[in-house]
Amino acid sequence: MAKITGEEDFVYVWTLGVEGLGDGSDKLVTVDARKDSPSFGKPIRSASVGGRHEAHHGGFTDDRRQFWAAGLSDSKIFIFDVASDPSNPKLVRTIDDFVQKSGGAAGPHGAYALPGRMLIPSLSNKDGTGTAALVEYSNDGDYIATQWLPTDKEQRGARVEKIADGYGYDARVLPRKNVMLSSSFTGIENYMRPLGDVVNDPEAMKKFGQTMVLWDFHARQPKKVLHVPGVPLEIRWAWGPYNNYAFTSTALTSKIWLVYEDERGGWKAKEVADIGDPAKLLVPVDISLSADDKTLFVDTFMDG
């Protein structure tokens, strides 16, 4: 996997709309990252999508000509042209039939570039209960395929370590090993509720993911369901050409987990570090691995 080198001219930030602020809509905000620019470090443009859609994650297509941004509440996906004028992105397409075309997946979580395609992991199904899928589109926004995550009832050929809960969140690929890894969160019935209500609802707290799925990437076939309790979220594969491992953090138990290839070519998961006291509900979310694979950065949702 060739690294992206150099420095960005602009940074795109997918932002939540706030009622009473501007038009109140979600927006893609452009920040000037040119060091010699008088507006360096400042927002210079915003592209409204109209309405609030629980803006969450986004990502570039493989050719970096488009930026895809997803809304968790109504399952809309917004496609921006960032190539024609990188300083002023334009909304060129809105996908509003994600649930219908995917066969019932809902809550598109992010956008992960594949060659000529975009991979969209969902957080839920249309019923809100959490059974999730990986949905693929062409770079132009045309639906291609849906792959549902394994469950205890429908294991889809996967070997299950303990349970197959079917929850989804992130998905990342290690192409040279033909391996894709997906993680797990919770369904719409939980993530669209106020966090305080969920935490104080014992039944709701039982409905969170504790699995990661190892896939045959080319076949899109789930091979093994790893037991990773505590809600594993973001996945980051190591960069080094011989480093066959990935990290994730668990939101409810505040742990760092390692997913690695053992000496026999099998894949395993183990916890390797504590982030903090889970009783304080730090909720580690995003993680970033440095380009030399030596430093892992973790941010926490509740205390900044």
Roles of regions detected by a PLM:
Residues 1, 24, 54-56, 106-107, ...:
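Beta-rich catalytic cores
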Residues 6, 12-23, 121-131, 183-207, ...:
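Short, conserved, GDST-rich strand-edge loop motifs in beta-rich repeat architectures
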Residues 7-9, 63-65, 115-117, 176-178, ...:
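Short coil/turn segments that connect the beta-strands within blades of beta-propeller domains
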Residues 26-33, 131-141, 199-219:
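Beta-propeller blade signature
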Residues 30-39, 79-89, 138-142, 258-270:
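Short loop/turn segments immediately following beta-strands, especially the blade-tip
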Residues 40-113:
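Blade-loop segments of beta-propeller domains
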Residues 42-54, 92-104, 146-166, 222-231, ...:
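Surface-exposed loop and turn segments in beta-propeller and other repeat-based domains
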Residues 82-175:
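Asp-box/WD-like beta-propeller blade repeats and closely related beta-sheet repeat scaffolds
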